[in-house]
């Protein structure tokens, strides 16, 4: 048995570090890295289990160009919605891979703390519960892995929480206080659940690790890339400058736009996601947040 992590950014490297503790594991990325067990993409794709951390907006093209269906089992560790076709990641992967061979990782985790071996809990989500259990067994003891079959619920939570995290960063950047941020995050959870239930997600997913757990973490910590985007927006910095200085992908930016488009098409009420998109497009941040906090 062998595992290959695809993508050697901070998140991919952290997962490689964790999986390597008890398993034979290699890592690969588009750009060669000076790290142990780094292999070419061709070698990585020969492994039995793949862990994909490819940015959401690049996933469809990457699969078209690189993936040869050899029956591998895949754990998708990215989060977001493709803005080109408004598809969730599970829908994109299912165009190329049998759903029985797919699992999706969710839950409140930061790469930095995984590298420090600090305890955490996460969820392996799959329509194939035997596969979910298999991937859960790969994690070291300080990473408690649960399983779920609510793939769409996990996908909605993983994407949506990044949008609320931008709003949380804006709220803190404006100095509105802990009360305001807590109100915004709580209402964000309700909005996220409303959006997810439209697509058939289970209620309990939003109250667990994939939903409330990941949302509360991501929307209130400086370790969150999307939260830091919000801080920059509150300081009236240009979005391009914020993203360049970040040096990593902040999926919430594209996800806010995708959610707004989907919500308009489906008639779903998503005031926070809509206002985040407006602020990303240049609307005055103080007026936007004031409007959100004043809604009934």
Features from the language model and the residues they span:
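Glycine-rich, N-terminal phosphate-binding loop of Rossmann-like dinucleotide-binding domains
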Residues: 8, 53-55, 220
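General beta-strand structural signal in soluble alpha/beta enzymes
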Residues: 76, 101-106, 145-149, 207-208, ...
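Internal alpha-helical scaffold of NAD(P)-dependent oxidoreductase catalytic cores
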Residues: 47, 65, 92-101, 119-205
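Rossmann-like NAD(P)(H) cofactor-binding subdomain of soluble oxidoreductases
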Residues: 12-16, 41-117, 132-136
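NAD(P)+-binding Rossmann beta1-loop-alpha1 motif at the extreme N-terminus of oxidoreductases
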Residues: 1-49
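A general structural signal for well-ordered alpha-helical segments in protein cores
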Residues: 59, 86-90, 132, 163, ...
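Structural beta-sheet core signal
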Residues: 5, 27, 74-76, 104, ...
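NAD(P)-dependent Rossmann-like dehydrogenase/reductase catalytic/cofactor-binding core
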Residues: 168, 197-201, 205-207, 211, ...
């Amino acid at each position: 048995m062998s595992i290959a992590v695809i993508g050697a950014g901070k998140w991919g490297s952290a997962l490689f570090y964790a999986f390597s503790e008890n398993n034979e594991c290699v890592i690969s990325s588009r750009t060669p890295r000076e790290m142990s067990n780094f292999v070419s993409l061709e070698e990585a794709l020969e492994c039995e289990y793949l862990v994909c951390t490819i940015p959401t907006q690049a996933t469809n093209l990457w699969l078209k160009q690189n993936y040869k269906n050899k029956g591998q089992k895949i754990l998708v560790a990215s989060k977001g919605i493709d803005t080109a076709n408004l598809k969730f990641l599970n829908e994109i992967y299912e165009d190329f891979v049998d759903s029985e061979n797919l699992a999706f990782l969710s839950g409140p985790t930061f790469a930095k703390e995984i590298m420090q071996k600090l305890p955490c809990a996460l969820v392996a989500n799959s329509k194939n519960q035997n596969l979910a259990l298999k991937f859960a067994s790969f994690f070291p003891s300080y990473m408690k892995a649960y399983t779920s079959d609510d793939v769409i619920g996990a996908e909605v939570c993983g994407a949506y929480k990044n949008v609320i995290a931008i709003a949380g960063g804006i709220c803190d950047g404006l100095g509105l206080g802990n009360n305001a941020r807590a109100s915004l995050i709580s209402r964000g959870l309700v909005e996220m659940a409303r959006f997810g239930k439209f697509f058939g997600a289970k209620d309990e997913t939003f109250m667990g690790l994939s939903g409330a757990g990941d949302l509360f973490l991501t929307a209130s910590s400086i370790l969150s890339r999307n939260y830091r985007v919000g801080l920059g927006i509150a300081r009236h910095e240009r979005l391009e400058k914020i993203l360049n200085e970040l040096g990593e992908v902040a999926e919430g930016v594209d996800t806010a736009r995708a959610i707004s488009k989907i919500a308009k098409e489906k008639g779903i009420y998503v005031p926070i996601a809509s206002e985040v998109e407006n602020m990303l497009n240049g609307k005055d941040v103080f007026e936007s947040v004031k409007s959100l906090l004043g809604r009934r």
